[in-house]
């Protein structure tokens, strides 16, 4: 190429598509950053639509590749269920129907193990509302016992004040089957449902939640204090209020529930 030709190539105006790509990349980075680096093309596209930008998934994928943006891969969580006990086991009333017509109709709960420091452990108990996937209750402790799960349940009850007709589903673990835990459920008129023994699909929503948590913020923390602080920020500030969820109409759990309130 001649010097004049090279100069002409270097100084020619950008095409309209190149200019548009550059503009979209700014928005894409805003979405990716707002999603704390957890968003892939589907949720970035949701942000674009909310901002009035109609961009194909294929184009977003291309732009993400050009910018080196990649969402984190989901991990499986470590099972902590202790089903070897003599407590009564409730029937599986949920039957893998993870839908709900309104808040406080169906809750699911489970516990997962976290790593603390070099050799330590902690346990995170969570209760989700199946209507919106809102985390209604959670607690963290160095000991996986009934006090941990009851603490998460008490947070959920205080936060939501559910009426009659609520179904609570969990695995058959001793912390959920314990007399103390069952007494709290009974006191609030909550019906208990439990997964079949060893069947993770009966509580698949909770498995998916913990996998999301561990892929997005990890499962190792320097201390119990750090774990509690990071989980508070992730659950209360990000997950419930901002993180888009496919089961909540691609909205955040809080936004999905506000939609119901406005409709009423």
Question: PLM ranges: what are they?
Answer:
Residues 1-264:
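Charged DNA-binding/catalytic regions of mobile-element recombinases
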């Amino acid at each position: 190429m001649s010097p004049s030709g090279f100069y002409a190539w270097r100084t020619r105006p950008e095409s309209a598509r190149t200019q548009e790509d550059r503009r979209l990349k700014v928005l894409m980075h805003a979405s990716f950053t707002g999603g704390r680096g957890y968003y892939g093309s589907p949720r970035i596209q949701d942000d674009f639509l909310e901002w009035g930008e109609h961009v194909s998934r294929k184009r977003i994928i291309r732009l993400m590749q050009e910018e080196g943006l990649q969402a984190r891969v989901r991990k499986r969580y470590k099972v902590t269920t202790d089903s070897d006990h003599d407590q009564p086991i409730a029937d599986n009333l949920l039957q893998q129907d993870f839908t709900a017509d309104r808040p406080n109709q169906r809750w699911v709960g489970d516990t997962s193990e976290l790593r603390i420091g070099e050799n330590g452990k902690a346990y995170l108990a969570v209760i989700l509302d199946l209507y919106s996937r809102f985390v209604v209750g959670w607690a963290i402790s160095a000991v996986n016992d009934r006090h941990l799960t009851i603490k998460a349940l008490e947070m959920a009850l205080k936060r939501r004040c559910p009426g009659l007709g609520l179904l609570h589903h969990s695995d058959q673990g001793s912390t959920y089957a314990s007399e103390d835990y069952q007494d709290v459920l009974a006191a609030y008129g909550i019906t208990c449902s439990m997964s079949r023994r060893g069947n993770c699909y009966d509580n698949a929503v909770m498995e998916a939640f913990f996998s999301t948590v561990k892929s997005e913020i990890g499962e190792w923390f320097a201390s119990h204090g750090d774990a509690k602080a990071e989980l508070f920020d992730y659950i209360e500030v990000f997950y419930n209020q901002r993180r888009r969820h496919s089961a909540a109409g691609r909205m955040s759990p809080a936004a999905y529930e506000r939609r119901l309130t406005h409709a009423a």
